[in-house]
């Protein structure tokens, strides 16, 4: 397996973890979180999910 594919796999798993943690923070906001911050986090998660989708597409193309 090529090195860049290995890096993409690590990145995919890391990103999945970040998305899950962010979603938990949205569901149960930390003390002191404001509405605007939570809305911004929701948008950030949307962007991360889009990035994850395309990263997975690239990995599929590589046969992973």
Task: Explain the meaning of each model-derived region.
Residues 1-64:
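Extended, charge-rich alpha-helical interface modules
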């Amino acid at each position: 397996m090529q090195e860049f594919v290995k890096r993409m796999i690590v990145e995919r798993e890391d990103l999945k973890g970040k998305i899950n943690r962010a979603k938990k923070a949205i569901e149960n906001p930390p003390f002191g979180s404001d509405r605007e911050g939570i809305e911004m986090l929701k948008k950030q998660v949307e962007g991360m999910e889009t990035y994850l989708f395309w990263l997975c597409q690239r990995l599929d193309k590589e046969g992973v």
